[in-house]
A protein has these predicted regions:
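AMP-binding/adenylate-forming catalytic core of the ANL superfamily
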Residues: 123, 129, 140-142, 302, ...
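Conserved AMP-binding A3 loop
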Residues: 65-67, 198-226
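Conserved AMP-binding/adenylate-forming core of the ANL superfamily
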Residues: 33-37, 53-87, 91-99, 103-107, ...
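Conserved pre-ATP/AMP-binding loop-to-beta segment of ANL
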Residues: 184-202, 208-209, 239, 244-252
Length: 566
């Protein structure tokens, strides 16, 4: 007989259990913390050597074992400290596509007490320059393409550069990974505490520039442990998974999202480090390539954004490949259409649909749902397991009654410390240890969370957060633009795409093509509006003077405003 959800949480996190919770204090706030969590991530990386000759990373035709990865991590740690002079608390930026070197760089940086700055590999030169300046990075580890984009910034800021997989001769003073990595060197060690900073992940900014979300070692480890505990809690509380038809296979992950995103970094990559699991790395998303890798590598866990699940099950090549190894298909980053839940369940023989509602600011952890629970609650994002707590609050920050709508707030040891160099944004987002999500929703009597709308002016495009203010800031740099309002336009595959309505200055002209050419060098491609409306009259505003973006969106959807498409 299954337990209630509360009983399962109590049993899994009780005294004597691996996931035992005890009273603790984090940044002056009392909360439950994991008794048996490692003190810092360096212990996880050092411990991974114990997995020895087990396969860790698979990339194209390359196979790297845990022991081989550990040797390279130790060598890079030595290089960072002994050659580049990296000290505890220094920021080291990583900017590259999904390569094995990203994984090893992350581990080496954090294990010497430095802070890993994860840079979006789709950024333009201007965006990359801002993050290097804002973070105060002293070293950049990057691939060839990111070096070409950021080289001038590094020269200007006197940043040391290490290039992986260089495709052409490098300028004097720029190091090549394969030539300078001192294999055989021992790890220099570091004195690291649980509440020391470990990572900075940049999120799109609500006021024009990205914000660096800072996580401590404790926060990241709390998230990893909470993910592990949650699986047991769900099964003990009655969530039924499919009976496997066929042989059991070892748990493994396919990396289909960028490592600079929290999903790729924490629940996927770091889970493999902790549990000694295989991680098959995709350079970029391609559904047929993913199907081929799933069959060849016998992948069990497919964790991405709903767009990728949609691509997978709708691929014309789906029936060509054996996907019977899959046990979990889904992820987070955006709400999932209810039709997709059923389609994944029907098409993936042994795979269970799943959804997680996490954020960069929660280290990807949050309410989640899978298996029979998801099929019976397809519009919910699930329930939060301990030590996370969820509340729905009104505009006065007071909890609302069950079933009523309000803003969703999170609490727990997995939350970020705050935003780098942004005490204003930190104070606005984190109040008495509780983090505001920016999403509107409700909780039902059984604790299921339902996300209904957004407080934030944000578009979710294929799992990427795009803030209207950031895109508008770039658009307003064009001299012809008088007014600009950015909004989301529904899209079957992407969830949403970016739209904009523009009024040009008197006596000036601007075509959509001219706008696209202007923005191509200003902001990352995924932020550039693909639906552009050039208005002949001022944009609609409310009594407070704010643009009526939902009204503009509806006009574009209905076709009463004609948008040029890219």
């Amino acid at each position: 007989m299954s337990m209630t959800f509360l009983e399962a949480n109590t049993a899994v996190t009780g005294p004597g259990q691996i996931f035992e919770l005890i009273d603790g204090e984090v940044r002056g706030v009392k909360m439950k913390v994991f008794k048996n969590a490692p003190a810092h991530l360096g212990q996880v990386f050092a411990g991974s050597r114990g997995h020895g000759d087990k396969t860790f990373l698979v990339y194209e035709d390359e196979i790297i074992t845990f022991a081989q990865a550990a040797d390279r991590i130790d060598a890079l740690a030595s290089l960072l400290v002994n050659t580049y002079g990296v000290k505890k608390g220094d920021r080291v930026a990583v900017a590259m596509r999904n390569f094995p070197e990203w994984v090893m760089s992350f581990a080496a940086i954090i294990s010497v007490g430095a802070i890993n700055v994860s840079m979006n590999s789709w950024w333009t030169e201007d965006e990359m320059d801002f993050a290097l300046e804002d973070s105060g990075a002293t070293v950049l580890i990057c691939d060839q393409q990111r070096f070409d984009i950021g080289a001038a910034s590094c020269v200007k800021k006197n940043i040391k550069v290490l290039v992986v997989r260089a495709e052409k001769p490098l300028p004097a003073g720029i190091d090549k990974w394969e030539e300078v990595l001192p294999l055989g060197d021992k790890h220099p060690g570091a004195d690291i505490s649980p509440d020391d900073d470990a990572t900075i992940l940049y999120t799109s900014g609500t006021t024009g520039r990205p914000k660096g979300a800072v996580s401590t070692h404790r926060a990241i480890l709390s998230s990893i442990m909470a993910f592990s505990a949650r699986n047991t809690i769900f099964q003990m509380s009655g969530t039924k998974l499919k009976d496997v038809d066929g042989p059991e296979v070892p748990t493994s992950f396919i990396l289909i999202v960028p490592l600079f995103h929290v999903t790729g970094c924490v629940p996927v990559m770091l889970s493999c480090f902790v549990a000694g699991l295989k991680l098959a790395i995709m350079y970029k998303w391609d559904p047929e390539k993913a199907l081929e890798m799933i069959e060849r590598e016998q992948i069990t866990n497919f964790v991405g954004v709903p767009t990728q699940s949609w691509d997978l099950v709708n691929s014309p090549a789906f029936e060509k490949y054996d996907t019977s190894s899959l046990r979990a298909v889904g992820g987070g980053g955006a709400p999932s259409p209810t039709s997709l839940v059923g389609k994944v369940n029907d098409k993936v023989k042994n795979g269970n649909p799943q959804l997680g509602y996490g954020m960069t600011e929660t280290n990807a952890f949050g309410p989640a749902i899978t298996g029979s629970d998801y099929l019976s609650h397809p519009t919910s994002t699930g329930r939060a397991s301990w030590p996370m707590m969820v509340e729905v609050r009104d505009e006065n920050l007071k909890p609302v009654p069950t079933g009523q709508s309000g803003e969703i707030w999170f609490f727990g040891p997995m939350l970020i410390r705050g935003y780098w160099n942004r005490p204003d944004a930190t104070a606005e987002t984190i109040v008495d240890g509780w983090l505001r999500s920016g999403d509107l929703g409700r909780l039902d009597a059984d604790g299921y969370v339902y996300v209904e709308d957004r407080v934030k002016d944000m578009i979710l495009r294929a799992g990427e957060n795009v803030y209207g203010a950031e895109v508008e800031s770039a658009i307003y740099e064009h001299p012809a633009v008088h007014e600009a309002a950015v909004f989301g336009v529904p899209h079957e595959r992407l969830g949403e795409e970016v739209g904009v309505a523009i009024l040009v200055n008197d006596g000036m002209t601007l075509t959509p093509e001219e706008l696209w050419a202007f923005l191509d060098i200003k902001i990352a491609k995924f932020k550039i509006p693909t639906q552009v409306v050039i208005m002949s009259e001022p944009l609609p505003r409310n009594a407070a003077g704010k643009f009526l973006k939902r009204e503009l969106q509806q006009h574009v959807v209905k076709g009463t405003l004609k948008a040029a498409s890219r």
